[in-house]
Amino acid sequence: MRAILFDTETSAKENGEVIELSYCDVYCDGVDEFSGPNPISRGTITTLRFKPKGGISFGACAVHHILPADLDDAPPFDLELLPPADIYVGHNIDFDLKFFPNRTPVRTIDTLA
């Protein structure tokens, strides 16, 4: 089983664009806790930044501290960059997943709940 732990930062709270995507793969061999050991391995942590088509709101900058100048050399956002997974884990995950309509997870875990 493959889980992706991920988070996005956006250019605005409403109608924003993804300006940062961070994720980490977590793999499980599929053995559950009642059947025996459940080895879990962690993959690489990846952080990618993107230049928005519009600007970055002051409120968004205050939250994530990413300034427009930090994105001058960044490529545009590509929704294909979030890897496919069996489970997606994130904080306020419904907000983050709306930027990746091509990813339909089997399950999600929201740390906001």
Identify the residue ranges that each predicted region occupies.
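Conserved non-catalytic scaffold segment of RNase H-like nuclease domains
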Residues: M1-T111
